[in-house]
Amino acid sequence: MKDKKPEHIDTKCHMIKPLNFALIGAAGYIAPRHIKAIADTGNNLLVAYDKFDSVGRLDSSFPDCSFYTENEQFDRFCSKQMRTDNPLQWVSICTPNYTHDAFIRYGLRLGCDVICEKPLVLNPYNIDNLIELEKETGHKAYTILQLRLHDKIRALKEKVANGPEGKVYDVDLTYITSRGNWYYASWKGDVHKSGGIATNIGVHFYDMLQWIFGPVKKNIVHVMSVDRVAGYLELDRARVRYFLSINAECLPANAVQGEKRTYRTLSIDGEEFEFSAGFTELHTESYKQILAGNGFRISEARPCIETVSEIRHAEPIGLVGEYHPLAKLPLAKHPFGWDERR
């Protein structure tokens, strides 16, 4: 159902006023895409917050944006702004995964609508709590599920929907995005903060697969270690073998020869589906859809959050049944000697 558009009409001059945004996590990896999306949609970034001060990226679009490295100062600014005739309307969140639900709650209680980077939350029960808070505050939270806006992926969904009724596709998903030792020292290397490999680098793929092929009927994990996860998903219209890794040693020979550090491929019934291009403007398109009342609400993220949560808590069964060919690769040790499964 289409949401009501935000009220930002200047009744005196009948012009659409720019919406005011606050950005939490301005120094993060994904923040530039949100900053660009706010600018590209003609809106205003009033204030930004991050514990780290490497935020020169603000200069290109919002040099007058207020910036704070202390949460208390940021909150003071936001609270004062809400009592003016030029209040904040939106809070965008680009922080580490484990903080998402807390900052979503902050934005809703502040009196704003919220846009949160994926994964929306780490656990399904967080979704229930946020839906209740939406009802209490009268404000809404949206998530970024940008693969649903990719032209080729939308075309694939339409092709499957219009294809033979009841056909079940055989799908192989491989995604290797090489990361160095820094990854393990950061919050991303801590399963309690990132959610693990499946959540941190794979949640958008699990959303895409279910959006196209239907809900998960069976969820099996074959291999899960500090740098990879491999498993099998049986969906309503697909049998999916997947392999996700951050270890460059897992890259296939053709990627290594081409000096590529990232390898992404999706095979459907033995035919490769290419969708590596076309990602650059998807955050801007996501913002356009959200601001037009067509964004992806909290409940739409539930299937993929449930899937990655089940994977995180699963006990790997080993190389049994329908496993991805790369699942056979030798396991690597944690670079710091830690044996905790991440």
Briefly describe each language-model feature range:
Residues 181-251, 302-306:
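Rossmann-like dinucleotide-binding domain that binds NAD(P)(H)
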Residues 229-281:
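C-terminal substrate-binding/catalytic lobe of Rossmann-fold NAD(P)-dependent oxidoreductases
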Residues 45, 64, 87-91, 165-168:
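Local beta-strand N-terminus motif with an aromatic residue
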Residues 66-131:
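Beta-loop-alpha module in the N-terminal Rossmann-like domain of NAD(P)-dependent dehydrogenases
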Residues 98, 121-181:
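A contiguous active-site-proximal alpha/beta segment in oxidoreductase catalytic domains
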Residues 2-64:
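N-terminal Rossmann-like dinucleotide-binding module
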Residues 1-17, 78-82, 90-92, 288-342:
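C-terminal helix-rich "cap/oligomerization" subdomain common to oxidoreductases
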